[in-house]
A protein has these predicted regions:
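Bacterial N-terminal signal peptides
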Residues: 13-23
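Sec-dependent signal peptide cleavage junction
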Residues: 21-39
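A conserved glycine-rich beta-strand in the N-terminal activation segment of trypsin-fold
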Residues: 65-82, 89-122, 145-146, 241, ...
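Short conserved beta-strand and strand-loop elements enriched in small hydrophobics
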Residues: 92, 134-141, 193-200
């Protein structure tokens, strides 16, 4: 524990400096979903440049390198948080029926266990991960099972799934726990504080990435009617819906989108709870 604390103290000043440097760059939003690569100039529904566009400059590329440097240096800490929160994180697989060409559309994302009520597991994810008719999840121990879409809000990019206890043996249920959550503001978090973004692409908790908090509340470039957390990290496709944790494993938001250069946005925990209450009414 002493060694872990020292790592964070050593990194704290560097994280704050990186945050201040990157925040001075006029970053534009990228689409929350995967799109074409480098040659693409298409925009999202909100006019935001997509992943892989050429909207780059020397300052922005330098900032990206700084994010990568911090991420590499503190990866052991992210790995610890990944293990600490493993029982909360799931993979989300959403796919269509077979179309007239014999094709199935599929998207992969991440999710977080919000509530277990004795008969159902409630999982929070991103609404844009739930566009198709069928959904399955991979639970922390690797068990794959069907899930039902309970609720989907494109206004806040939040969605909720349910998994019936009756599908699962007791030993699988015993390895799943709801994540403890709180608003970052209620925890007294500030610019420069460390975060860990967990992706469950392919398998639960498959990647844990160090992040640094930039702002507690900004207008979401992908949706100007929404306020989100802004942070810097190396998240990638498949991270959407995944949890953003504090270094102590407290869930403060869920990943919604990010640009090519390390700026990321997360739906705040309080918004997720508010939407969950709506779907239960």
């Amino acid at each position: 524990m002493i060694q872990k604390t020292n790592v964070w103290k050593t990194a704290a000043g560097l994280l704050l400096i990186i945050s201040m440097m990157i925040s001075s760059v006029p970053v534009m939003a990228a689409a929350a979903e995967p799109v074409a690569q480098a040659e693409s100039t298409e925009t999202s529904d909100y006019g935001a440049p997509a992943y892989g566009t050429k909207a780059a400059n020397l300052h922005r590329l330098t900032s990206q390198e700084q994010v990568q440097t911090v991420s590499k240096a503190l990866q052991p800490v992210a790995d610890v948080v990944g293990v600490l929160t493993k029982s909360h994180n799931v993979s989300v697989i959403n796919y269509s029926d077979v179309d007239e060409l014999g094709l199935i559309r599929r998207s992969d994302g991440s999710g977080v266990v919000l509530v277990m009520d004795g008969s159902r597991i409630y999982i929070a994810t991103a609404a844009h991960c739930l566009k198709q008719n069928h959904t399955e999840v991979i639970l922390p121990d690797g068990t794959r099972c069907s899930a039902a879409v309970l609720y989907r809000s494109t206004e806040t990019d939040t969605g909720f799934l349910t998994v019936e206890y009756s599908q699962l043996p007791e030993e699988v249920l015993g390895g799943i726990t709801p994540a403890a959550g709180a608003d970052a503001s209620a925890l007294g978090m500030k610019t420069g504080d460390a975060l860990v973004a967990v992706s469950s692409l392919d398998s639960p908790s498959s990647a844990s990435c160090i992040g640094v908090l930039d702002q507690l509340s900004v207008i979401y470039p992908n949706n100007p009617g929404q306020n989100v957390l802004q942070f810097y990290s190396e998240t990638s496709y498949g991270s959407s819906g995944g949890a953003v944790y504090t270094q102590n494993g407290i869930w403060v938001g869920s990943i919604s989108g990010g640009d090519t250069y390390g700026t990321c946005w997360a739906v705040p925990y309080g918004t997720i709870l508010t939407e969950f209450q709506k779907c239960l009414i």
